[in-house]
Amino acid sequence: MRKRIWVGLPLALVFGGIFAFHTVFHIPEQPEMTTISDGSFNQQLHCYESSTRASIDQEGRLNLLVWNIYKQNRANWQSVLTQMSAGAQLILLQEASLEDGLKRWIASGGWSGEQVNAFKAFDKAAGVLTLGWRKPRLACGYTQLEPWIRLPKSGLYSEYPLSDGQMLIVVNLHAVNFTWGVQEYQQQVNDLIAALKEHPGPAIVAGDFNTWSEKRLQAVTERLENAGLIEVVFSPDQRTRFITGLPLDHVFYKGLEVQKAEAPQTDASDHNPLLVSFTLPTDK
């Protein structure tokens, strides 16, 4: 009898853990996207298209905020987000939890956007969120499963019209983290930047790349450089760094001109935000 109890106990713990995981987390079978427009939040599947012609830049200027917002777990996230996004036309958030406080903030600012539902925890969606003062022409969500913890990371591909007639590609990425090698990491990056090599116009690829090792940093840098993108240099550079000293968050671009780039410090998240001011090229 005692042997049966000891054999059954580990099995009970395993099945109990599986049950608890599926009770807390809901993982979509395919990427799901929530579209945001005029204060309304609507569920879409994978891709969204619009007929908008409104340009995302403002008279040739494009101010960008990139920030892993840590699921809004810090009490001062809202005031800092308001401060950091002042004057921005484009916001790329990672680990955004689409709860009531963030929904109200988005609606009050008149933002349009899309969130990729990587997973839901206690029925609240979390994933990358791209917000713009104008709607995108196209937006598609992507997910890549973390091989160890079995929770996906998400990415969002968007296309925005520009005032000079070109189309801007924007990729908002939260890269997989818990991998032994770089295979899953490379696959996620490859899926999202596949269209960049064929795109002759401007592009921005930004987010939390989880580049905590030299192999990861090299993998993403080589692929983006091969697609013609350049990494933004920040000053001051207070980007969040791993114990290896490597920064986790990056902005890459092509077909635009950088006027200012800074990564200030804040305690409103476990990541510091990235602020970049672009202009459209004058010698197109």
Curated annotation (Swiss-Prot):
<dbReference type="InterPro" id="IPR036691">
    <property type="entry name" value="Endo/exonu/phosph_ase_sf"/>
</dbReference>
<comment type="similarity">
    <text>Belongs to the UPF0294 family.</text>
</comment>
<protein>
    <recommendedName>
        <fullName>UPF0294 protein VV2535</fullName>
    </recommendedName>
</protein>
<dbReference type="InterPro" id="IPR005135">
    <property type="entry name" value="Endo/exonuclease/phosphatase"/>
</dbReference>
<dbReference type="GO" id="GO:0005737">
    <property type="term" value="C:cytoplasm"/>
</dbReference>
<dbReference type="InterPro" id="IPR022958">
    <property type="entry name" value="UPF0294"/>
</dbReference>
<dbReference type="Pfam" id="PF03372">
    <property type="entry name" value="Exo_endo_phos"/>
</dbReference>
<dbReference type="GO" id="GO:0003824">
    <property type="term" value="F:catalytic activity"/>
</dbReference>
<keyword id="KW-0963">Cytoplasm</keyword>
